[in-house]
């Protein structure tokens, strides 16, 4: 099959899957909504006030938020894999999500214990600061080690340290706030509002557009820094852009939904395998579509499998994402042994 035809089919399939999963997220739940209920609520002609409230205030903003954050997480993972030239680099593995998680937990505990409310922008700024701190630590380690496996292990250790400190911080939260902090720290898309959607969209969409605009120099960067510099890519500025974009995307996800594992690692590789191409110009849009669809599927499972009990989203993404990482490591080991 020709590459262009294969990509066309793959993109159409991903778009169809995204639309189908988005619709299912609106229909399914502890209270099932019929297509007529959905249409009436969207058109403002419904007489069922409960159905309209469930759709417009709960399920629709949540589904839109899942699409935004799923796309952000997948693209952030791809940017990190490009920057570190490491196939298992990702916001969760490299400790970036955990750094953001620690900063947000500190901010929430300080504000909530003083009876103050934390706005979305405050949490995002805190998450970005934590993500950048973790990223700078990883970069400092990267200058001292040659083997990427050591760097990944250091990233995982950073994640454990940040998670341990976060647990200590949560222990000092007031009893009334512990449940919310615990649910957030486990990863969840529940409780999303249209205000959250607007704030996330204002950050995620420009970052995704910027990443797409960087796809051409990214392709040169993948061939090595020397080659990228020889074709006119400002390597230092480009590297800073990758770090900032990936950290901001990961921070936005963590601020709203908590740390979510394996999406940033697994989805980019599934997209490259599906498209049969590793070119950023082709992979980046696929990562956005694939990440959104993957998170919609996982969120649907998380809230429907044992309803009304809702699973943490990170638990579900790990179940589906971890086997992909294992497959990737086994395949690379087999290729290296040849």
What does each model-identified segment do?
Residues 1-338:
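Alpha-helical transmembrane segments in inner-membrane proteins
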């Amino acid at each position: 099959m020709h590459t262009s035809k294969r990509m066309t089919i793959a993109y159409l399939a991903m778009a169809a899957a995204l639309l189908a999963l988005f619709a299912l997220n609106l229909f399914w739940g502890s209270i099932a909504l019929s297509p007529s209920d959905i249409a009436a609520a969207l058109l403002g002609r419904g007489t069922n006030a409960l159905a309209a409230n469930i759709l417009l205030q709960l399920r629709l903003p949540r589904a839109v938020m899942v699409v935004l954050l799923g796309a952000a997480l997948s693209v952030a993972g791809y940017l990190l894999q490009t920057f570190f030239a490491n196939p298992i680099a990702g916001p969760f593995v490299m400790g970036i999500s955990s750094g953001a998680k620690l900063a947000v937990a500190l901010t929430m505990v300080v504000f909530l214990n003083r009876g103050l409310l934390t706005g979305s922008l405050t949490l995002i700024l805190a998450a970005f600061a934590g993500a950048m701190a973790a990223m700078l630590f990883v970069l400092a380690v990267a200058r001292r080690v040659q083997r990427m496996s050591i760097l990944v292990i250091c990233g995982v250790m950073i994640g454990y340290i940040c998670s341990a400190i976060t647990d200590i911080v949560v222990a000092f939260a007031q009893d009334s706030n512990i449940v919310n902090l615990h649910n957030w720290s486990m990863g969840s898309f529940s409780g999303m509002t249209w205000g959250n959607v607007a704030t996330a969209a204002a950050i995620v969409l420009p970052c995704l557009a910027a990443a797409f605009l960087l796809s051409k120099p990214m392709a040169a960067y993948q061939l090595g820094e020397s080659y990228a510099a020889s074709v006119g890519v400002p390597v230092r500025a480009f590297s800073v852009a990758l770090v900032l974009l990936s950290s901001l995307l990961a921070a936005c996800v963590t601020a709203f939904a908590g740390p979510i594992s394996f999406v940033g690692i697994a989805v980019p590789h599934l997209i490259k395998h599906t498209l049969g191409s590793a070119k950023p110009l082709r992979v980046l849009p696929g990562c956005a579509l694939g990440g959104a669809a993957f998170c919609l599927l996982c969120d649907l499972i998380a809230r429907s499998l044992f309803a009304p009990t809702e699973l943490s989203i990170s638990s579900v993404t790990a179940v589906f994402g971890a086997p992909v990482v294992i497959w990737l490591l086994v395949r690379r080991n087999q290729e290296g042994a040849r």
